[in-house]
């Protein structure tokens, strides 16, 4: 993978996908700025771990507070809503996952674009992938391209000729493939948090835990997060 002698901003949640994307960005760009968004999500431990991962990699991290709890409704934000226990029970009557946060990725990309534009950075990296979450409308290639077009039209890029590029290195990959890619890049997943219930110790029951657990089993290896928790006596 050739090094791009430019900077990039990465939308970094601290989850497994964005951790893989962070390692990819470190190999691809000369400097990486991690934008970590606290949007009043239930799994706020993710932002704490995200800052730890960024520190471990000597990546400049920026924690952005942008609460969505008074704007949107989602089981990932509203603690009174029940987190689904399986993929089969994870959708509402309209077929939309109850863990979908309305237009979250659109909001985050807008924040990232403003953040990047202010620093004259024209690359944005995301950990979006579609195969494991096909019913999330804001993770598709079409959505990402439309957002890229909107950013290029609605920022100074339309005047200066500088062009924003949104990178989606995980699009089209399964969770197993994402983990394998990360391991090849030297990724440490021991601090990556995926559980929807908002605890460092995963429940191993929610859809996110289920997908992650199955992926590591397919690779015949223990989840590095579980390994770390065992060593620390937390599990």
Question: Which sequence ranges carry the predicted segments?
Answer:
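Short, Lys/Arg-enriched, disordered terminal segments
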Residues: 1-6, 231-235
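ATP-dependent adenylation/nucleotidyltransferase module used to activate substrates
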Residues: 2-185
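Iron-sulfur (Fe-S) cluster-binding modules
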Residues: 29, 37, 225, 231-235
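Secondary-structure transition/capping residues
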Residues: 123, 158, 189, 217-220
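Alpha-helix boundary/capping detector
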Residues: 141-142, 150, 208-209, 232-235
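Immediate flanking context of iron-sulfur cluster ligation sites
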Residues: 184-204
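Iron-sulfur (Fe-S) cluster-binding segments and ferredoxin-like electron-carrier domains
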Residues: 201-230
